[in-house]
Amino acid sequence: MAPKQKKKTSRGKKRLKPVLAASEDMEPVNMESMGHPEIYPLVLTTKTQEIFNCRIDEDVTDEQPYKLINKEDIFEDLRNRAAVSDFHPVKKIVQEYPGNELLLVYDKDFKYGLNFYLIATEEGKENYLNPPEVPEEQEEYKEHIPEDVYIYKPPVSKPWVSLGSEKEIEEESVTESTKQITYMISRKRSEFGAPIKFSDQNASSVKDAYIECTAYPDKNFTLKQLEKDVGMQVIPQIKDISTQTKWTYPKNATTQYYPREFSEEEKETLKQSKPLVDFLNNASISVEIALQQNEIMNTFIDDWKYLAEEEGTFGDKTDTHLKEYQSFTDLHSPTEKMITCVSWHPTIYGLIAVSVAVRLSFEDRVHFSGKLLLQPSLILFWSFSDPIHPQLMLESPDDIFCFKFCPSDPNIIAGGCINGQIVMWDITAHADRIENIKAGGSRSKRATLKPMFLLEPESNKEAMYIRHCAVSSIENGHKKVITDIHWLSDTFEINRMGSVFENRSGICCQLVTCSADCTICFWDIRPQKPLTPQTTEKKKEESIEIPFDVPSTFLHLDLSWKPLTKVRLSKGETSLDHCPTKISLNEDHLLCKTQDKMLAQSKTEKAEEMNPYHNLESGMANLLKPIDDFCTKFFVGTEEGEVIYTDWKMEKDPETGRLMSKKPVSHHTIHDGTVHTIQRSPFYNDIILTVGGWNVAIWKEGVMTGPLLQSCCAPKRYTSGHWSLTRPGVFYIGREDGYIDIWDLLEKTHEPAQSQNICITMITYIKPWIFSSKQQFIATADYYGTLHILEIPWTLSRPSTNEMASVNHYFEREVKHLEYVEQRKKIREQEKKEMELEMAKKKVKTYQKSKEQMQAELKMDYESYLELEKTVLINLGLIKVTEKGSYMEVM
């Protein structure tokens, strides 16, 4: 049935092209492909319209677009005009039509391709003239259906109009500019038809006279066919076919099921029946045995699976190397820079931030200080979708050497400069820009990253520079480069005395930094209560107009931010202090755990709704009681290679009454160079990795005798390190020659399990990242400013069975070994003391002499005295040598 035509304003008459006469054997074309086999499109010329009184906009209009035509009139037109008649294509249809009148409909919108169409069945004519009435429910249902329904219109051939594209094609096409010369070569006419004479010829006398086909082994007979076990089942093939039927008359209907139940009489009869009692008595023993088995062990465990996992983890050596996935280089930087710090975005997958600094020594930096002021110091945000253009560029007053995302809100970033200032950024206004990056996609679709050749970089994208919103005070902050920065956990806060209090705000509000000026500073980003109220006139004088593109989140800190407290590491009796380079707090391991990423995402969504950093209030530490059982000790790595375990709490000097730092709890000089990595294990809170100089050490908090593991000197100096995020016994160490040493404590504890070359220059930073359960990456930065993204293989990312317990058992053995060594050291010292006392006793030991021995000794002493006296007198000339007699006689 043809649907009713829509009521629209008339567009006027259309000029129709002349149609060639159809051949006698041409089949009429109907609209069966569109679901209307009874409709046959026609082209009626103006002459035909006048003959049959169906002129457009006169006889047939929008209100009455159809006309009933007598069958005999059509036959008369066919006899008069023959093949020229417009009804000639449907002549066969008209002859087979059972009725006397055919329905001709004006197709104003060319729905079926021509200006008229003929309905060739009585049923179709009745449905068009008398459409079935639609119920009211169906009318209401149709009101909600959009009227703009797509109507298929077959393409109509049109004459080609030149718009100049053929000239471009002719210019790009290659044509021959010179005329070709044709040569025809043939034999002499006299040689045609000459007799042919064949003779023998030596094949070796003429070069290339023959082609030799030497024998060779056919590889088809040497290939080994592998056998494969394939299970087959003889069953008939099943094909799933589904159809979708339109619900013409929808109605609300509900269905409810309920179980069939026994009546009270049947229940009582069944309870007292003997078959039920016998069944319960027989089945109770089997059920009890099954329950006991479930309590004792898991009967459904797959033993073969666990055996295969151990073998596959340590036996599969085909995929053990890091594979380079992508690399990023700042091609727009005019100067040569190195990467100083790397950090993956906590919530947006595929986004990584790096800080860059100029590769200059201290003397060169002072010499070129004027030129360096003209170049921006940046933190670059790279995305996997565009390896050439950074997504964001954070500007800072000077080169950044360390930065961290805020755990409560990833849009807040804190960084430390080379001049000792702390810089704060707020990228909340640009969060939508970096969240809609192609590589990251939606957060629900992150199974695998797309390869590089499927990503389309935005070549015309302009760089987005973001200015910092606050910097610390130059006079009251650090005096030298800031080497490390950390956010304190959102569960606690400290005051100027170092006492720990509960953090009621629920967000991270404090920072800790260490610098080469021998200080460790704690900072609070909340506004501090002024001691004296300021007048409104003074506030107006101090107010500074900020640019419109700089958020006012930390406006109260800009150029007036002072540290909450300072900690100095004294060297004891001397006036010198230790120079810290890296620190590790007790709460740092919480930020490294992989399961905290979902928590970070929920915190991000909450921060977007409430914006807690836009309405910061001063701390409540003065109103709360301090937490006494909180561990305030932390590890510090120094520039001289020392590892110090100290306390951040301050104490008063009994003589001066000033606040001073406590003495370090323990102090060890293990490394022969600057400590640049000190990090807690993400699996063990009390295990710390330190890297510095030419060796690596692993410590346990609470063990003051020394490190659990200390490596021997490496062939090249170590420059960076990081724990694995999924394997407790694996950590990565970067070297100055571009190699990465991969340590696996389950395989080797005295040397790296493997070493792999990554670049040709020094590796400056290492940062792993978990993308999914099947894919992990490790970001490696080098001295030339290139960021290498490496894919971690399966053997280094998937932990083996009971690996955590095995590594923990290894650490416990090392602790016992240290205790044994300490005991042996004390015993040996005691033995040495006893041996020294024994030797001293032997030296001063006196013997008891007899009376005869004492008289003999006195006599010998007296005789030696007389001999000496005689010699002196002879020398003085008092007696002569020739004189005989004893000296006693002379006397």
Curated annotation (Swiss-Prot):
Q: What clinical condition does the entry mention?
A: A rare heterozygous in-frame DNAI3 deletion encompassing exons 14-17 has been found in a fetus with encephalocele. Overexpression of human DNAI3 RNA lacking exons 14-17 in zebrafish embryos also results in similar brain malformations, suggesting that DNAI3 defects might be involved in encephalocele formation.
Q: Which UniProt keywords apply?
A: Coiled coil, Cytoplasm, Repeat, WD repeat
Q: Where are the WD repeats?
A: 395-435, 477-533, 670-709, 713-753
Any one GO BP annotation for this protein: inner dynein arm assembly
| Alphabetical list of InterPro entries matching this protein | Dynein_IC (IPR050687), WD40/YVTN_repeat-like_dom_sf (IPR015943), WD40_repeat_dom_sf (IPR036322), WD40_rpt (IPR001680)
Primary residence = cytoplasm
What molecular function terms (GO) are annotated for this protein? Arp2/3 complex binding; dynein heavy chain binding; dynein light chain binding
Q: Does the keyword Repeat apply?
A: yes
Q: What does the UniProt entry say about where the protein is found?
A: Cytoplasm
Instruction: Identify the domain of life.
Output: Eukaryota
Q: Which GO terms describe its cellular component?
A: axonemal dynein complex; cytoplasm; inner dynein arm
Region named Disordered: 1-22
Q: What does this protein do?
A: Acts as a negative regulator of cell migration, invasion, and metastasis downstream of p53/TP53, through inhibition of Arp2/3 complex-mediated actin polymerization. Via its association with the multisubunit axonemal dynein complex, is potentially involved in the regulation of cilia function. May play a role in osteogenesis of dental tissue-derived mesenchymal stem cells.
Membrane-spanning ranges: none
Provide the coiled-coil residue spans. 818-861
Share what the entry says about its subunit structure, partners included: Interacts with ACTR2; this interaction reduces binding of the Arp2/3 complex to the VCA domain of nucleation promoting factors. Part of the multisubunit axonemal dynein complex formed at least of two heavy chains and a number of intermediate and light chains. Found in a associated with the catalytic heavy chain DNAH2, the intermediate chain DNAI4, and the light chain DYNLT1.
Annotated organism of origin: Homo sapiens
PROSITE patterns with a match to the protein in the record: WD_REPEATS_1
Describe how expression is induced or repressed. Answer: Up-regulated at the transcriptional level by TP53.
Basic residues bias spans: 1-17
Q: Lineage in the entry? A: Eukaryota, Metazoa, Chordata, Craniata, Vertebrata
Instruction: Please report the name of this protein according to its UniProt entry.
Output: Dynein axonemal intermediate chain 3
